[in-house]
C-alpha cells in the first residue's frame, strides 16, 4: 500500500469519472492513486458525471484518455450511450477505459468495441488501467504499433464468456414450478416498522466477512514465507487482523461508525411478477407494489414466486430492512482522500463498507430469529458466531432469501426509494430519491427484501 504522490504531467493525462446516476467511487479513486503514483496527470471529476462534463474536461486538458467507472448494472447502459455521444461528436480519437463491477471483458472488448469507433479497453482493476495507459503512451511516442497486443483475440475473449447458443422461443409461465406453495407460512411477531439504535460494534465485528474486507476492499494478498511457501488463508488472516482491530478501535474512538436499523414485517401477496404490500392482514388497502423480472429460461424464477399468490385467499409475509453505518465514516473517508492520505482512506472506506454488510448479515439473522426459523440454520448462532457458522452465512446456508436492489433478480433502483418510504428511513438519517439517483445516502447503507420461503436463494433473472 502507498501514499499518493503528485503525478508528472509529461507521462500522460487522463480524465476519470463515475458515470451519471452512479455514486460509487472507490474503484475510480484507486485508479486515480495508482496512475498518479506512476507519473500520470489525473483529473478525477467525481461521481454522477455526465458525458458532456467528461468531454469538456478532456478537451480543456488535452487528455490522452477518458476513464469511466460504475458499479451498477444500469451504468453499463450509460457507458454505451456515452460512447455513442463521443462518436457523434467526432471524438473517437480519444481512447476510453471502462471499469466497474457490472462490466465483463467480453461485454467491453467485444460488444462495446462494436459501438465505439475509437480505441476502447476494459480495466479489470487499477493495475490493468495502468498497463493500458503505459501502452497508449508507447504508441504516442512510436515505441509500439497502434493496438499491437492490445486487442484480444477471439480465443482470448472465449475464455471470458460462456458459449452462446441461439435461444429457442419458449413459453414463459406466470409462476415457476420450483417455488411450490406447500411451505409453512411463518407469521411475524408484529406488523409495521421499528427503529433500532445503539447496536454494539463489537457484536457487528463478529459478522465481518474477512475475505471480502482483506482482499477486495483492502487489497491485501498472501505473502511468500521464508521457506518459499505461500501463506495459508489462516496465516494470511492472522497477519491482517491486527490492522482490523486497530481500525475498529480508531473508528470507535472517533465516533465514525454509528450502526442503525429500520426494519419491519408486512402482509404481502404475489400478483404475477408483482409483490403487493398490504397495510394489514385484511388485504384491503395496498401500500405499494414491487415488480420483479422473471427468468426467460428454466426454472423461470421471479422473486414474487416465493409468496402466496393474491388469489390464494391467504396472507403471506415479507420483511424489509434498511441498515446504515451513518454519514461520519463517509465524510471522514472523503477528507482523507482529498488530503491524499490514500492508505488511511482505503482502510477506513473498506471498513465502512464491510461493517454495513456485517450489519445487514447480523440483522438478517435477527429477523430470522424473531420470525421463528433461525433454528433451521445448519449451525444456529448462540452469542458470537463460530467461523463455521459465519461461513454458512456467507454461503446462504440458511432458510430465507435476502434480496437487495440493483442486482439481476431485482434490478430497479427506484425501488430503493419505495423501501425508504415504506420504512420511513429518515428516522435513521437515510435519504433516497431522484436527487440521490435512487441510491442510499449515506453511502454505507443497504436495504433488502427478506423472504421466509425455503427455496428463496440468489438467482439471476435474464
Task: List the model feature ranges, each with a label.
Residues 82, 86-91, 95, 100-163:
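Conserved phosphate-handling catalytic cores of large alpha/beta enzymes
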Residues 28-38, 42-114:
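Cofactor-cradling patches in redox/metallo enzymes
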Residues 1-68, 274, 293-301, 305, ...:
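ATP-dependent carboxylate/acyl-activation modules
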Residues 25, 29, 48-52, 60, ...:
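Conserved structured core elements
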Residues 1-4, 8, 14, 19-23, ...:
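C-terminal amphipathic alpha-helical interaction region
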Residues 11, 63-66, 91-93, 117, ...:
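Active-site lining segments that contact anionic ligands and/or coordinate catalytic metals
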Residues 1, 22, 33-38, 57, ...:
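Generic, well-ordered alpha-helical scaffold segments in large soluble proteins
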Residues 127-346, 350, 371-390, 430-431, ...:
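Active-site loops and adjacent core secondary-structure elements that bind or stabilize anionic groups
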Amino acid at each position: 500500500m502507498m501514499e499518493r504522490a503528485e503525478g508528472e504531467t509529461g507521462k500522460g493525462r487522463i480524465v476519470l469519472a463515475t458515470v451519471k446516476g452512479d455514486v460509487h467511487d472507490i474503484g475510480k479513486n484507486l485508479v486515480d492513486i495508482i496512475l498518479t503514483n506512476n507519473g500520470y496527470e489525473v483529473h478525477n471529476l467525481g461521481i454522477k458525471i455526465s458525458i458532456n462534463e467528461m468531454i469538456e474536461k478532456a478537451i480543456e486538458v488535452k487528455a490522452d484518455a477518458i476513464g469511466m467507472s460504475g458499479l451498477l448494472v444500469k451504468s453499463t447502459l450509460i457507458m454505451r450511450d456515452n460512447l455513442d455521444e463521443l462518436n457523434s461528436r467526432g471524438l473517437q480519437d480519444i481512447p476510453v477505459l471502462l471499469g466497474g463491477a457490472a462490466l465483463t471483458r467480453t461485454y467491453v472488448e467485444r460488444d462495446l468495441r462494436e459501438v465505439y469507433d475509437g480505441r476502447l479497453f476494459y480495466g479489470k482493476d487499477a493495475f490493468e488501467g495502468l498497463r493500458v495507459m503505459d501502452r497508449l503512451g508507447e504508441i504516442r511516442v512510436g515505441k509500439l504499433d497502434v493496438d499491437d497486443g492490445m486487442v484480444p483475440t477471439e480465443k482470448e475473449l472465449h475464455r471470458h464468456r460462456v458459449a452462446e447458443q441461439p435461444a429457442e422461443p419458449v413459453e414463459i409461465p406466470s409462476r415457476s414450478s420450483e417455488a411450490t406453495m406447500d411451505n409453512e407460512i411463518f407469521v411475524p411477531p408484529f406488523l409495521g416498522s421499528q427503529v433500532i439504535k445503539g447496536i454494539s460494534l463489537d457484536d457487528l465485528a463478529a459478522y465481518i466477512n474477512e475475505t471480502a474486507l482483506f482482499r477486495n476492499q483492502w487489497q491485501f494478498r498472501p505473502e511468500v514465507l521464508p521457506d518459499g511457501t505461500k501463506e495459508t488463508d489462516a496465516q494470511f488472516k492472522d497477519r491482517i487482523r491486527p490492522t482490523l482491530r486497530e481500525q475498529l478501535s480508531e473508528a470507535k474512538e472517533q465516533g465514525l461508525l454509528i450502526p442503525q436499523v429500520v426494519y419491519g414485517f408486512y402482509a404481502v401477496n404475489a400478483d404475477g411478477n408483482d409483490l403487493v404490500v398490504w397495510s394489514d392482514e385484511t388485504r384491503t388497502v395496498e401500500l405499494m407494489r414491487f415488480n420483479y423480472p422473471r427468468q426467460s429460461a428454466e426454472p423461470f424464477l421471479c422473486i414474487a414466486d416465493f409468496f402466496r399468490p393474491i388469489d390464494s385467499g391467504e396472507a403471506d409475509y415479507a420483511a424489509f430492512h434498511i441498515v446504515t453505518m451513518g454519514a461520519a465514516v463517509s465524510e471522514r473517508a472523503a477528507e482523507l482522500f482529498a488530503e491524499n492520505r490514500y492508505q488511511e482512506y482505503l482502510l477506513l472506506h473498506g471498513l465502512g463498507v464491510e461493517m454495513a454488510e456485517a450489519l445487514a448479515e447480523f440483522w438478517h439473522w435477527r429477523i430470522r430469529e424473531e420470525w421463528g426459523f433461525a433454528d433451521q440454520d445448519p449451525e444456529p448462532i448462540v452469542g458470537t458466531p463460530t467461523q463455521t457458522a459465519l461461513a454458512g452465512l456467507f454461503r446462504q446456508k440458511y432458510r430465507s432469501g435476502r434480496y437487495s436492489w440493483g442486482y439481476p433478480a431485482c434490478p430497479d433502483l427506484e425501488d430503493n426509494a419505495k423501501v425508504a418510504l415504506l420504512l420511513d428511513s429518515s428516522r435513521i438519517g437515510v435519504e433516497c430519491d431522484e436527487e440521490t439517483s435512487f441510491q442510499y445516502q449515506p453511502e454505507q447503507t443497504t436495504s433488502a427484501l427478506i423472504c421466509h420461503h425455503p427455496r428463496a436463494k440468489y438467482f439471476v433473472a435474464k
